[in-house]
């Protein structure tokens, strides 16, 4: 991957922002006759609708992390390809960039009750400049099973919330949220992400094999 893709890739973080809105509640008292009518006022809710949703989302996220970490099933990762988008790069740059990201990784995974994939992983590979680049994080994919068999052919799409580091930045950890897609059959999957960017920066397809 190119050395300055981080600034542009932060745009991907907007894909994971959640806009929560709280509905307005209004109370109305009417009085049709001079007679005094006593009614019991409903107790106010302990939390607003948005607060409940936010807590539920955060609670679900933590629960998914914990359940995945506690699982005893392991993934193994083999980086196989990086591709710098030829429509967004000068030929002089693509000629010298490395697109064979030798490396290895492993992690834990699980499939939830709906058949969706959750993974915690750590991986290291050779970046565009032939320097070691580590990455680790949490991944989620919504899965589809065209044949109905969860052990057979499957496709997935989702996201990863990761942290990486590069030699250009003295290996200071940096957040890197990215999209994820995959196709798989039985134990083997091909998984990939795309790093967005500008001209001569970012716009890199990164693919790896995942064995489970």
UniProtKB/Swiss-Prot annotation:
Biased composition range(s): Low complexity: 29-44
InterPro entries, per database record: LipidA_acyl_PagP (IPR009746), OMP/PagP_b-brl (IPR011250)
Catalytic activity: a lipid A + a 1,2-diacyl-sn-glycero-3-phosphocholine = a hepta-acyl lipid A + a 2-acyl-sn-glycero-3-phosphocholine; a lipid IVA + a 1,2-diacyl-sn-glycero-3-phosphocholine = a lipid IVB + a 2-acyl-sn-glycero-3-phosphocholine; a lipid IIA + a 1,2-diacyl-sn-glycero-3-phosphocholine = a lipid IIB + a 2-acyl-sn-glycero-3-phosphocholine
Annotated site residues (Role in lipopolysaccharide recognition) in this chain: 93
GO CC terms in record: cell outer membrane
Signal peptide: 1-26
This protein's name: Lipid A acyltransferase PagP
Assembly information from the UniProt record: Homodimer.
Family, per entry: Belongs to the lipid A palmitoyltransferase family.
Active site annotation, chain numbering: 84, 127, 128
Function: Transfers a fatty acid residue from the sn-1 position of a phospholipid to the N-linked hydroxyfatty acid chain on the proximal unit of lipid A or its precursors.
Region feature Disordered, mapped onto this chain: 29-50
Keywords: Acyltransferase, Cell outer membrane, Membrane, Signal, Transferase
Gene Ontology terms for molecular function: acyltransferase activity
Cross-referenced Pfam families: PagP (PF07017)
Compartment annotation: Cell outer membrane
């Amino acid at each position: 991957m190119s050395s300055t893709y981080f600034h542009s890739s932060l745009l991907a973080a907007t894909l994971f922002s959640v806009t929560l809105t709280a509905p307005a509640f209004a109370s109305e008292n009417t009085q049709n006759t001079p007679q005094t009518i006593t009614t019991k006022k409903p107790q106010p809710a302990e939390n607003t609708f948005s607060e409940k949703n936010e807590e539920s989302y955060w609670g679900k996220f933590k629960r998914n992390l914990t359940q995945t970490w506690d699982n005893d099933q392991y993934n193994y990762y083999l980086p196989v390809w990086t591709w710098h988008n030829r429509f967004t790069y000068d030929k002089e740059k693509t000629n010298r960039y490395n697109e064979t990201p030798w490396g290895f990784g492993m992690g834990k995974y699980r499939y939830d009750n709906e058949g969706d994939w959750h993974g915690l992983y750590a991986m290291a590979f050779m970046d565009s400049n032939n320097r070691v680049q580590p990455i680790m994080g949490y991944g989620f994919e919504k899965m589809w099973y065209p044949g109905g068999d969860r052990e057979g052919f499957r496709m997935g799409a989702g996201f990863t919330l990761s942290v990486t580091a590069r030699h250009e930045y003295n290996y200071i950890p940096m957040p890197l949220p990215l999209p994820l897609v995959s196709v798989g059959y039985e134990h083997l999957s091909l998984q990939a992400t795309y790093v967005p960017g500008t001209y001569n920066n970012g716009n890199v397809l990164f693919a790896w094999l995942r064995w489970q």
